[in-house]
């Protein structure tokens, strides 16, 4: 992976099936394998350009931030969660248990990251400049 990340890019989107930044819930996450999580975060932090982590498989959505790393988790569009609230020190805003999806809109020098419900209402958003 390190060799791949040495290639030139304007903006990096890293996709993972489980959350990287979330630490406080009891479900599967990179924090359950702390050495690998630390290695991945350190590797991403070394990159000079902006990056975004996208993840899913939580049956809820949210946006997380650690230093200059941002992660959007979205899922699911057809089967939300019955758990109504969840917190995390790295969470921006709150998590959403209703059906949702993530949308990335790339512009000349920025990416708009949105978490949207099934009725197309924006639940959370953040803009990342690069």
Give the label of every model feature segment.
Residues 1-130:
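Long, structured stretches of catalytic cores involved in phosphate-ester chemistry, encompassing
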């Amino acid at each position: 992976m390190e060799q791949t990340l040495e290639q030139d890019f304007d903006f990096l989107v890293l996709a993972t099936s489980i959350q990287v930044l979330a630490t406080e819930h009891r479900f599967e996450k990179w924090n359950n394998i702390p050495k690998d999580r630390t290695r991945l975060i350190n590797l991403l932090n070394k990159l000079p350009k902006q990056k975004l982590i996208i993840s899913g498989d939580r049956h809820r959505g949210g946006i997380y931030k650690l230093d200059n790393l941002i992660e959007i988790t979205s899922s699911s569009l057809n089967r939300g969660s019955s758990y109504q609230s969840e917190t995390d020190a790295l969470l921006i805003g709150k998590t959403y248990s209703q059906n949702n999806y993530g949308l990335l809109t790339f512009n000349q020098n920025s990416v708009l990251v949105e978490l949207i419900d099934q009725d197309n209402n924006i639940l959370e958003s953040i803009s990342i400049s690069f």
